[in-house]
Amino acid sequence: MSIKTRKIGWIGAGRMGYEMAQRLARGGCDITVWNRTRAKAEPLARDGAKIADRLTDLAGCDILFCMVATYADVKEVIAGPQGVYSNARAGGGGVPPIVVECSSISLDGSAELREILAGFGSKYLAAPVSGNAKVIKAGKLSFVCSGPKPVFDEVMPFLKLI
């Protein structure tokens, strides 16, 4: 599948997440972005991104990226009462088959997230980043990835675009 035919969900439009999502949008990806403060994500629409009203709007994406501040935030947006997976618990709707977590979270948090996602049948790639917004704009962001090789291979074209 082409990167332009995969549906990408993106959570987090802060300093780093905004720039990362923007590179995907400008690269022609079909990307839908959610941010707690919607106004911070709205400018991404000029680059072709769709803006989600609810986290559950991202449940039907092929690959979900998450770039938020803390593990508590990660857990809330993924598995919280209003999180991406909240309808799946109630039996209403699909879930992303792949989740790529780009925040810097603890090893324990990453292991817990992997277990939560596995319970829904989703695959997990830990992909914390090294760099800043200037590095992202220059296309030089570094990822430190951990997870199954087939998942890494599937996500790699998007990581390269970022």
Name every feature range the model reports, one short phrase each.
Residues 1-66:
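NAD(P)+-binding Rossmann beta1-loop-alpha1 motif at the extreme N-terminus of oxidoreductases
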Residues 25, 42-46, 75, 114-118, ...:
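Class I S-adenosyl-L-methionine
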Residues 34, 67, 103, 145-146:
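Active-site-adjacent beta-strand anchor residues
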Residues 41, 74, 134-137:
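A short acidic, helix-capping loop that chelates divalent metal ions and anchors anionic groups
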Residues 55-123:
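Rossmann-fold NAD(P) dinucleotide-binding segment
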Residues 104-162:
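Rossmann-fold dinucleotide-binding core
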